[in-house]
Design a protein with these regions (language model features):
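Helix-coil boundary and interhelical linker segments in multi-pass alpha-helical membrane proteins
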Residues: 25-48, 101-115, 149-169, 219-235, ...
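Intramembrane alpha-helical segments
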Residues: 2-6, 25, 49, 56-57, ...
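Residue-level recognition of pore/gate-forming positions within transmembrane alpha-helices
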Residues: 23-24, 51, 99, 121-124, ...
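Alpha-helical transmembrane segments of integral membrane proteins
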Residues: 14-18, 38, 42-46, 50, ...
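Cytosolic, membrane-interface loops and tails of multi-pass inner-membrane proteins
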Residues: 1-4, 59-86, 180-203, 251-262
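Extended hydrophobic alpha-helices typical of membrane-associated regions
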Residues: 219, 223-288
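The first (N-terminal) embedded transmembrane alpha-helix
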Residues: 10-29, 146, 276-278
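Multi-pass membrane catalytic core of lipid/isoprenoid biosynthesis enzymes
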Residues: 46-51, 67-117, 173, 191-232, ...
Length: 288
């Protein structure tokens, strides 16, 4: 049983929350324009369950595609598929079982959202191959991992607006930053086996690159606030969120590249940032 918990990464739930928070931001933003407590809570629950399912399926699929790469990387060589403890066939069966409840959730939404949700499949399928062909797999993950922003808005309004795009790109730059931090754990091994990442591309200018990513996210959140007429407190709280990201960059600069535990802790702290933005958005429903 524990093997399947490990295969689905349920023992490492940080990825579930990083996938869920952008969905929650978007769902909460809809309530700035039309308050429907029942649907809001219902969709939050469905999106959270969906995040668990899709993150698990994505991890299994990535492990299948990256089997040979994972075996050559110190941090991942003991993963169940890479080590041969679970067969590729069993892994595919696991994905099949996960897709069924995911589709059940998706098909509760309107037709626009169904098409939008299904279209994310192309990004999910393509993502694991990006590290082989470009130094920007983290950017591609950003576009993939934040698709829930578009979906969260569309389940209420059946469209995509400028506000949605701004929030989507907020998540993309945030993911680009935090996944670059995550990739630092494997930088030495990735250089040896020629796996590409932004952690490698910007290894000599990491601080400036991370600041670029995080400043872009905060700037977009500020722009969103002005566009939607947010309250003064919104901008104060966004400034506090900006400090959170700033401290990440400062701390990561002081960590040695072989200290994977500390790198992981900085990466994990993004769960707090995601929660903070959700709470800021939630407060705006009633005080904005």
């Amino acid at each position: 049983m524990y093997q399947f918990v490990s295969l689905l990464r349920l023992n490492k739930p940080i990825g579930i929350f990083l996938l869920f928070w952008p969905c929650a931001w978007s769902l909460t933003m809809t309530q700035w324009f039309v308050v429907n407590n029942y649907l809001f809570i219902k969709y939050l629950i469905l999106f959270f369950i969906g995040s668990i399912i899709m993150r698990s399926a994505g991890c299994v699929y990535n492990d299948i595609v990256d089997k040979k790469i994972d075996f050559r990387v110190q941090r991942t060589k003991k993963r169940l598929i890479a080590s041969g403890k679970i067969s590729v066939t069993t892994a595919w069966l696991s994905i099949s079982f996960l897709i069924i409840p995911a589709l059940i959730i998706l098909f509760q939404f309107n037709n626009f959202s169904k098409i939008l949700g299904l279209s994310s499949g192309l990004l999910i399928i393509t993502y694991p191959f990006m590290k082989r062909i470009t130094f920007w797999p983290q950017l591609f993950l950003g576009f993939t991992f934040n698709w829930g922003v578009l979906l969260g808005w569309s389940v209420f309004f059946e469209n995509i607006t400028l506000e949605t795009i701004i929030l989507y790109m907020t998540g993309v730059f945030w993911t680009l930053g935090y996944d670059t931090i995550y990739a630092l754990q494997d930088k030495v091994d990735d250089l040896k086996i020629k796996v590409k990442s932004t952690a490698i591309k910007f290894r000599h200018d990491l601080k400036n690159f991370l600041f670029f990513c995080y400043i872009s996210s905060i700037t977009l959140l500020v722009a969103l606030g002005f566009l939607t007429g947010r309250s003064f407190i919104y901008f104060i709280l966004i400034a506090i969120a900006a400090l959170h990201l700033t401290f990440q960059v400062i701390i990561i600069q002081k960590i040695k590249s072989n200290n994977k535990d500390k790198i992981q802790k900085v990466f994990n702290s993004n769960n707090s940032f995601g929660l903070l933005i959700f709470l800021i958005f939630f407060l705006e429903i009633y005080y904005g």
